[in-house]
Amino acid sequence: MRYNAGSYDIVVIGAGHAGCEAGLAAARMGCKTLVCTLTLDSVAMMPCNPNIGGTAKGHLVREIDALGGEMGVNIDHTFIQSKMLNTSKGPAVHSLRAQADKKKYQERMKKVLETQENLHLRQLEVVSVEVEDGKVKGVLTKNGAFFECKAVIMTSGTYLQSRIIIGDVSYSQGPNGLSNANELSKSLIDLGIDLRRFKTGTPARVNKRSVDFSKMIEQPGDEEIIPFSFISGNIDRDQVSCWLTYTNEETHKVIQENIHRSPMYNGSIKGVGPRYCPSIEDKVMRFQDKDRHQIFIEPEGDDTEEMYVGGMSSSLPEDVQVQMIKTVPGLENAEIMRTAYAIEYDCIDPTQLKASLEFKNIDGFFSAGQINGSSGYEEAGAQGIVAGINAALKVQGKDPMILTRSDGYVGVLIDDLITKGTNEPYRMMTSRAEYRLLLRQDNADFRLTEIGHNVGLVTEERWNKFQERKQNLERELERLKELQITNKTENNEKIVELGSTELKKPIRMYELIKRPELDYFSLACLDPERPDLPKDIGDQINIIARYEGYIQTQLEQVAQFKKFEKKVLPEDLDYNDVNSLRIEAIQKLNKIRPLNIGQASRISGVSPADISVLLIFLEHYRKTGKNTDN
């Protein structure tokens, strides 16, 4: 029986990584927020890999943190190993990765939600989103409770009509043995939302006591622990190791002999899987020139013997999985605790969304996370905080926060999803960001904290710490650019000791730092008046000085990019009325409805010639009295 259960400003459907960030952002911005989850035991659950961050994903976590989100703070409290990846490469691709204690991560995040002012966390299954005259009115639960609200954020993850697949066994269930949501999809279809079917998977977990680590290569954490959050401060903690091993010819033989039993290859799986995280059977069949593949054995927490077998995601039958795992060095006697599985689920076509993550045709209805066709905890959290901020701004009658490709990886992620769409689970990579030297993980706060503060999410504590960090960097850069190092004998002796060449004439310290064999830290011997600053300030100075020319080039590219982004296209424009556009371009433009010329130029099927036509049209449109160039 239906009954009115109360009213909220915002209702969040789902409490995974997107839902947690969305709910916290909305509540912290002063909105009365309800966060619904199928079970309170799955808040911030990690159904797959037990880590946060990694290449490009670490950038997203830093950006979530810079905006005022919780993911970075939460992993800093609960990690069991920390590692900076890609340190042999340039700073644009340096990425922080932390091994999580999965249960502690969940428990702390749940506690944060439970104690957050303005936030009500409840175990409820939402079965429909109710809309009237194109505007959200509320949500209805399976128990008949109707919650009136001004905005809804859908963060339902991989739970919509999800199906677990292990060989020829298939059943209706959510990830990790949890129940799924089978009714919400129909509500979305009734609202005119296009759905598609995606697939992802997870590897087996084995008992630590049954693993022979002597046959594996130890992968310890970094001695210097670098936190994800800009407000965490120094962290000193004992760390655990991960372990590396490899598949071999015997492993591949087991897979090849049983490939006919794989639902990936016999047609049982209809959903599209992630290109950049293929199953082990997919890797073996697609890359037959490779005689081995990496397997990482990762602990799932301090208080469990479960070990994650990274790199062996599979949907092969259980008996084949047992054979396959026992061929891997160190896993000959491994006891499987959880069987690997594939999961199919409903998700939306993200081109139905605006850059604010609000549906174009439903006022007040937002969507974030894997339901939008992305993969990964970090991608979900990044979308979640943007949706939460924009839903709150919507309720408050304010303009949305739109992050562009030059603002951060979050902007790249959202722009890719809403402009190009995706035919497979979308994974963030550094190669997707054109301006990655500007969008480094070390400067996320310089790019985004002011934005987070302006929308009312960044706390005064965080803002004050950011201001101090910003001032320290600016003052030190200014000092170094003015500090002159003379070519006197004493100075030259020290410079030669550092492996560099003597000075022929005086030089500014800032220019001296640019020498590849020198850096800010080693030159302290020539700088007795140097202030005592945190190490991260010195790291920033090294990057800014050494890559100054490249950074300036990218800044010029961004200036050009912004010119097109400022050429706004009319919201109600019917592209059939624009003369000389090709039919394909008209169809794509009418579907995507880009905000501006920049976004239009990134739509697949819209050519440079079409963009020229649009620019001519806009010039005529402007001359008739409607200015679209901000």
Curated annotation (Swiss-Prot):
Cited SMART domains: GIDA_assoc_3 (SM01228)
Primary localization: cytoplasm
Keywords, alphabetical: Cytoplasm, FAD, Flavoprotein, NAD, tRNA processing
GO biological process, one term: tRNA methylation
Cofactor: FAD
Record-linked InterPro entries: FAD/NAD-bd_sf (IPR036188), GIDA_C_N (IPR049312), MnmG (IPR004416), MnmG-rel (IPR002218), MnmG-rel_CS (IPR020595), MnmG_C (IPR026904), MnmG_C_subdom (IPR047001), MnmG_C_subdom_sf (IPR044920)
Binding site for FAD: 14-19
Zinc-finger listed as a keyword: no
Residues that coordinate or bind NAD(+): 273-287
Location relative to the cell: Cytoplasm
A cellular component annotation (GO) from this entry: cytosol
GO molecular-function term, one example from the UniProt record: flavin adenine dinucleotide binding
One family name in Pfam for this protein: GIDA_C_1st
Highest taxon in the source lineage: Bacteria
This protein's record includes keyword Phosphoprotein: no
Functional note: NAD-binding protein involved in the addition of a carboxymethylaminomethyl (cmnm) group at the wobble position (U34) of certain tRNAs, forming tRNA-cmnm(5)s(2)U34.
Family in the record: Belongs to the MnmG family.
Subunit structure: Homodimer. Heterotetramer of two MnmE and two MnmG subunits.
Protein name: tRNA uridine 5-carboxymethylaminomethyl modification enzyme MnmG
Origin species: Clostridium perfringens (strain SM101 / Type A)
The gene coding this protein: mnmG
